[in-house]
C-alpha cells in the first residue's frame, strides 16, 4: 500500500505535494519522494528513505519553484527500503509513481531487455521503462502510449505520470488500486485517497478503471480506451477537514477511539424505524434475506474479525450456514457459491484489492453481494448489488478502532433484520436486540471517560509476562 498525489495549477506545487503526502503517510512511510517541473520545464526528482518530514528538509534546500508535480510515500513490496527503490522512477522521457503490484514485471524485464538499465529492484521502474518504449513507438502520443502500456501489464496499479515534453500535464490511470481526482479553482488534483484532496475541494470523482485522466492547470479530462471523452460521476465528501486532523490528540488512533460513540450513532440511528432495523433508505430489500440458504462473509484483516463475530451471532439465530473467508484465499478455495448464497463483503475503504477480487468472483458465480463500506463511491460500493454505508468518517490510524465498531454494528443490525424477516424472532425480540445494541453507546462513553483509570491499569498490565483474554462464543473473537 502506497500513497500518491499529483497536482497542476497556479499554487506552489512542492508545498502542496508535501502537505498531501503528510496526510497520506499512514499509507506508507518507508520512503517518500516528489517529481516536478521546475521553471525551466525540466523534471526534477527528490526522494529519500524515511518519513515525509525528512523529504521536506531536502526539498527546502533547493530554490526551485514549481506548479506541476507528483508525490509518493511508500511501503516496500518489491525491493528493499533504499533511495533507489523510492518513487518517483524515471526512464527516458517518463517519470512515474505507482501504487500496486505488477505481477508480470519479470517477463517485461526480459521482453524489453531491461536487465542493464534498471537501477532499482522495483516492479515500478520496469513499468516506467516499458512506458518510455511505447511512448517513443506511439510518436509521443500520451493517450496512445498509455493505452498500449496498460495492455501489457498484469496486476494492480494506480499510476501518475509526467512526460518530459508535456510540462504542466499529469496523466493518471488505474486498475484495482484506488485513485480519485478533482478540478478546483486552485488547480487539478489526483490522489490515492480523499484525505489528500479535502483541503481544496469536497467534490471529486473516482477514476474509472481502464480510463485515462489528463490533468492540466485549467481542466481535467477523462478518456476511455477508444479516446472518447467521458463525464465522470461527481461525488461529494460528507466530512470536513477537521475529521482528518488530530485536533489536539497526540495521534490518530486515540482520536478515533474517542470518536467511536458518535460513529455508532451515525451508523445505527438513521436505520431505526421505531425500535426495529429498517434498510429501506439503503435499498436493501427483505427478499434478499429470504432467498438465501447460506451466507459467505468475505473480508481481510480487522474486517474479517468482525465477520467472525457475526458468524457466531448469525448461525445460532438464523440456522443457516455462515462461512467466513479471508478474501485473499477465497479465489483459491473453489467456493461453493450460487444464486442462493448471500455474499457479505466488508471493507473500510471499499478499495481492498483482495476483497474486491473475491467479490467479483462471488458475483460471477451468481451470488448477490451486500457490501459494508465506509467510503461513498468506492469501487466495492459501486460494484456491489447492495451497500450498507457505515458513517465513521475517515479512519487514518493503521490500527482499526471506530471502523471495526461500526462494522460490528452493521453486521448486528443485518443479523437482526434477517432474523425478523425469516421468522427466527418476533418484533419484541428484535426490538430488544436493538435496545441492547444502543446500550453499547453510553457504555462506550463511560469507558472512554475512565481514561485515567485505564492508564493506571495499563501501567500494571505492561509489566506482566503473560496476559489471558477470556471469552465465550462471539466474545472470543473480540
Question: How would you describe each model-predicted region?
Answer:
Residues 7-9, 39, 99-101, 164, ...:
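Cofactor-binding loop segments of dinucleotide-utilizing enzymes, especially the Rossmann-like FAD-
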Residues 290-439, 476:
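Glycine-rich phosphate-binding loops that contact phosphosugars or nucleotide phosphates
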Residues 1, 108, 174, 243-246, ...:
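Short acidic (Asp/Glu) and glycine-rich catalytic loops that position anionic groups and cofactors
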Amino acid at each position: 500500500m502506497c500513497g500518491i498525489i499529483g497536482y497542476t495549477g497556479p499554487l506552489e506545487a512542492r508545498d502542496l505535494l508535501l502537505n498531501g503526502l503528510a496526510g497520506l503517510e499512514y499509507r506508507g512511510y518507508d520512503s517518500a519522494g516528489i517529481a516536478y517541473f521546475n521553471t525551466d520545464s525540466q523534471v526534477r526528482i527528490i526522494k529519500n528513505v524515511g518519513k515525509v518530514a525528512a523529504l521536506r528538509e531536502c526539498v527546502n534546500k533547493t530554490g526551485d519553484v514549481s506548479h506541476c508535480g507528483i508525490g509518493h510515500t511508500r511501503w516496500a513490496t518489491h525491493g528493499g527500503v533504499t533511495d533507489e527503490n523510492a518513487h518517483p522512477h524515471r526512464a527516458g522521457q517518463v517519470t512515474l509513481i505507482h501504487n500496486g503490484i505488477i505481477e508480470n514485471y519479470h517477463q517485461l524485464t526480459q521482453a524489453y531487455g531491461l536487465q542493464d538499465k534498471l537501477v532499482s529492484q522495483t516492479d515500478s521502474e520496469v513499468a516506467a521503462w516499458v512506458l518510455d518504449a511505447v511512448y517513443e513507438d506511439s510518436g509521443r502520443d500520451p493517450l496512445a502510449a498509455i493505452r498500449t502500456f496498460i495492455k501489457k501489464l498484469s496486476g494492480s496499479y494506480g499510476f501518475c505520470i509526467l512526460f518530459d515534453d508535456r510540462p504542466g500535464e499529469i496523466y493518471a490511470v488505474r486498475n484495482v488500486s484506488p485513485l480519485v481526482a478533482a478540478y478546483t479553482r486552485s488547480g487539478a488534483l489526483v490522489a490515492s485517497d480523499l484525505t489528500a484532496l479535502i483541503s481544496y475541494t469536497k467534490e471529486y470523482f473516482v477514476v474509472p478503471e481502464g480510463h485515462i485522466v489528463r490533468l492540466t492547470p485549467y481542466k481535467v479530462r477523462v478518456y476511455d480506451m477508444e479516446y472518447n471523452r467521458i463525464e465522470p460521476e461527481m461525488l461529494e465528501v460528507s466530512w470536513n477537514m477537521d475529521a482528518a486532523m488530530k485536533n489536539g490528540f497526540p495521534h490518530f488512533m486515540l482520536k478515533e477511539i474517542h470518536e467511536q460513540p458518535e460513529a455508532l450513532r451515525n451508523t445505527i440511528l438513521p436505520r431505526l424505524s421505531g425500535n426495529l432495523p429498517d434498510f429501506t433508505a439503503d435499498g436493501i430489500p427483505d427478499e434478499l434475506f429470504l432467498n438465501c440458504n447460506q451466507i459467505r462473509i468475505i473480508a481481510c484483516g480487522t474486517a474479517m474479525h468482525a465477520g467472525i463475530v457475526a458468524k457466531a451471532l448469525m448461525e445460532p439465530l438464523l440456522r443457516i450456514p455462515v462461512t467466513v473467508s479471508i478474501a485473499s484465499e477465497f479465489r483459491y478455495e473453489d467456493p461453493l457459491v450460487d444464486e442462493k448464497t448471500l455474499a457479505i463483503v466488508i471493507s473500510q475503504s471499499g478499495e481492498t484489492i483482495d476483497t474486491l477480487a473475491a467479490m467479483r468472483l462471488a458475483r460471477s458465480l451468481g451470488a448477490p453481494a451486500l457490501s459494508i463500506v465506509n467510503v461513498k463511491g468506492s469501487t466495492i460500493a459501486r460494484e456491489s448489488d447492495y451497500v450498507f454505508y457505515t458513517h465513521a468518517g475517515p479512519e487514518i490510524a493503521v490500527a482499526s478502532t471506530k471502523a471495526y465498531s461500526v462494522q460490528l454494528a452493521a453486521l448486528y443490525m443485518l443479523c437482526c433484520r434477517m432474523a425478523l424477516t425469516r421468522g427466527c424472532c418476533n418484533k419484541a425480540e428484535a426490538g430488544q436486540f436493538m435496545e441492547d445494541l444502543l446500550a453499547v453507546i453510553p457504555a462506550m462513553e463511560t469507558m472512554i471517560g475512565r481514561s485515567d483509570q485505564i492508564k493506571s491499569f495499563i501501567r500494571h498490565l505492561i509489566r506482566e509476562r503473560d496476559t489471558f483474554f477470556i471469552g465465550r462464543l462471539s466474545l472470543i473473537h473480540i
